């Protein structure tokens, strides 16, 4: 699993997320969702400080290399039985970990169309 991501704040323009990039900084994806958000805030505040001090030069985005993500729907948070055959424990752990509040919680459909929501999971090879 990729344990790092790149934060790329940009200047707003007429498009959505299409303006020039102010800076790019790698940050860690290790930990729960709250610690990842806190890390984003720290990395982002470093960039804002840099921008306000005049240390950043806006660079146009390469729209050919841009990636796009749609907003998650609650249905995308379902974990199906086939996932347990197709993914490792760490991959399922990461799906549950990234789908915490404020995102739709991950769930497993049970008998009677009820849902078992997964709020926290752990991977443990010692059991």
For each feature predicted by the language model, list its residue ranges:
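Donor/substrate-binding cores of folate-linked one-carbon enzymes
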Residues: 1-71, 75-79
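Internal anion-binding site segments
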Residues: 60-127
